[in-house]
A protein has these predicted regions:
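Clamp-loader machinery-focused feature within the broader ASCE/P-loop NTPase space
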Residues: 1-131
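Non-catalytic interfacial helical region
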Residues: 24, 85-189
Length: 189
């Protein structure tokens, strides 16, 4: 709700740090936010019947074109930053290297599709090595226009303090038994 409030009041921050214990849904939330941002118009233009009401949820239909493109990792407005392959290419590297972060430069050099937003998901920011963390920090200090960076972190205390200070934090916690029961009931389970 904090993210949606910021969106609906026009105070959408360029950097969001999504934190919480492993398995709580941080990456899932990052993908939902990305889908929402890429599928929702930048400006609520007034049409024949006035401006549409502000969105109440982050829900985007699974058959929406943006949903399909994100599922295929082919949306031009999304950049996924995660550990890449080792030099041998036989497994994933132990950390996100600065060479992976530099690829963001090419992404930002292109204008956003349809003049819309660009979204970067860093999953997980805990995996950034020192040089990569400093490169991300520079982008957070001078963000490109209409870009939102979503940093997933299991241990935010391990990140550079300056990265934490440049982001708004969304702290996730496991659902309690009553909240879990309500969620299951709402889902029809």
């Amino acid at each position: 709700s904090e993210f949606l409030d910021a969106f609906n009041t026009g105070r959408l921050h360029h950097g969001w740090l999504i934190t919480g214990p492993r398995g709580v849904g941080k990456a899932t939330l990052a993908w939902r936010i990305a889908r929402f941002l890429l599928a929702t118009p930048l400006v609520h233009e007034e049409g024949l019947f006035g401006a549409p009401p502000p969105p109440e949820t982050l829900d985007i239909a699974p058959d929406h074109p943006v949903s399909r493109r994100l599922l295929a990792l082919s949306d031009p407005g999304l950049f996924l930053l995660r550990r890449g392959p080792t030099d041998k290419g036989d497994r994933l590297a132990a950390e996100i290297r600065v060479s992976e972060v530099r690829k963001l430069g090419n992404f930002f050099a292109l204008s956003a599709a349809d003049g819309g937003r660009r979204v970067v998901i860093v999953d997980a920011a805990d995996d950034l090595n020192t040089q990569a963390a400093n490169a991300i920090l520079k982008m957070l200090e001078e963000p490109p226009a209409r870009t939102v960076m979503l940093l997933v972190s299991h241990q935010p205390s391990g990140l550079l303090p300056t990265i934490r200070s440049r982001c708004r934090t969304l702290r996730l916690a496991p659902l309690g038994p009553q909240e879990m029961a309500q969620a299951l009931e709402h889902a029809g389970i």
